Amino acid sequence: MSSLYTLWQQFYPPAPTFTEKDVGAGSQVGKVFIITGANSGIGYALVKLLYPTGATIYVAGRSPQKIQTAINEITSVSPSPSTPATLKPLHLDLDDLTSIKAAAAAFAAQESRLDIIWNNAGGGYPVGSVSKQGIEAHMGSHCVAPLLFTNELLPLLRAAARTAPKDSVRVVWTGSAQIQLNAPQGGVDFARVEKPTTHDMQDYGAAKAGNWFLAVEGARRWGKDGIVSVCQNPGNLSTPIYDIFGWFMLALIRGLFLYDAKYGAYTMLFSGFSPEVNKGTNGAYIWPFGRIKPPPRADVLQAGSEGKAKEFWEWCERSWKKHV
């Protein structure tokens, strides 16, 4: 598959075939979800899609004020759905590893199960950025912190899997077309992961490749517990991540290839609920707006299947064990 063709397929994907119509009103009563980065962008759009389902949804993010504003906006919809979800705030700062266990403990104090977590949060960082623990900023917030958070919640995922329908308990990671465009050879360059950001898009692409590695290794480790772990590229979407551009450039790229955030939420909806995502496709990579395909670069696919996913997972574990 040529690189131009795969880019075209990611930048201009076919229409979604799995939408909110496939996750009916009231269908998720009794289920508990976490969506990180849910006060804006794709995460916010996903909460809106899931609001009629009756689930309990934790809207996780760094700013309590923005989280509450998002919850107020979504719950004020008129007319109200017949089985509205219960939306709860969860403070989570992925730039600071010392806050992660507290966030997981706050969730566990309220819930006895977790059916799906969408590890969606994570933006771009300028050159020179590091997390509060000195990890390259993209790696810290997109990979190390989300893996720690998910690991802390693992007992609740396992608890849900014991009684939930087969293959319905899922961990959803977030990839990007930047894996193809900017990730280093083999996906992750371990010589750069503990240094400040040296190239914003290359380091972002490496972190997104890291997310797929975590999905692959998560599938290997958690599959026996009935947990499905996948990585999805939501697509090129009009979200706050592009606000760094001036108005002219922003208008140009929106006109060329940015879709409404709702379309990215459809990719996430597919990843969380489609029957195509199951034990047989555990560890899969999902293209916009809901298509299971291999990652678009052969070297990244090869690295993930030849032990680099395990190596990356273990590096993430060592990184947080130094600090928490």
From Swiss-Prot:
SUPFAM superfamilies: NAD(P)-binding Rossmann-fold domains
Biotech exploitation of the protein: Iso-A82775C is a precursor for the biosynthesis of the anticancer natural products chloropestolides A to E via a Diesls-Alder reaction with maldoxin. In the absence of the prenyltransferase iacE, siccayne accumulates instead of iso-A82775C and can also be condensed with maldoxin to produce chloropestolides H to K, which show also antibacterial and anticancer properties.
Induction of expression: Expression is co-regulated with the other genes from the iso-A82775C biosynthesis cluster and probably controlled by the cluster-specific transcription factors iacI and iacK.
Keyword Oxidoreductase applies: yes
Pathway where this protein functions: Secondary metabolite biosynthesis
E.C. numbers: 1.1.1.-
Gene knockout outcome: Reduces slightly the production of iso-A82775C.
Residues that hold NADP(+) according to the record: 42, 66, 93, 120, 204, 208, 239
GO molecular function, one term: oxidoreductase activity
Family: Belongs to the short-chain dehydrogenases/reductases (SDR) family.
Protein name per the record: Short-chain dehydrogenase/reductase iacJ
